[in-house]
């Protein structure tokens, strides 16, 4: 598929947002979603997939991604808020399945280099299984 273009306004600044639909060449998470790159999948559905983080920061650390390529949280929210809702719902389903929903967990979206985003494909970190501290670091 090609790419779509839409215009959004974030903080009063309008600009084009380019949406590249799955798969994007050289995108690690698109490769995982396409079963081209191995990962420890914990659950999936037609729109999202959840797999264990290769560098866990807690006893439970799972990433939930959309199967479509969206580079970050702001772009996903601006172009497909239904998919964002599905992603968050899947994160909660993962917490339930992993047994951390009752004691508590974090859902974290890192956005941009300074936000700690290392893969330019939006993903939610579901982190739990221990007492979390604040600030997160």
State the predicted function of each range.
Residues 2-137:
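HIT superfamily nucleotide-processing domains
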């Amino acid at each position: 598929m090609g790419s779509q273009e839409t215009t959004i306004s974030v903080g009063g600044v309008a600009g084009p947002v380019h949406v590249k639909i799955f798969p994007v060449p050289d995108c690690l998470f698109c490769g995982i979603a396409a079963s081209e790159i191995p990962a420890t999948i914990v659950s999936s559905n037609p729109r999202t997939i959840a797999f264990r983080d290769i560098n866990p920061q807690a006893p439970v650390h799972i990433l939930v991604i959309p199967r479509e390529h969206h580079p970050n949280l702001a772009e996903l929210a601006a172009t497909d808020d239904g998919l964002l809702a599905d992603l968050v719902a899947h994160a909660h389903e993962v917490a339930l399945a992993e047994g951390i929903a009752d004691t508590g967990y974090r859902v974290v979206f890192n956005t941009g280099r300074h936000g700690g985003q290392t893969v330019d494909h939006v993903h939610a970190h579901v982190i739990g299984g221990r007492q979390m501290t604040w600030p997160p670091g």
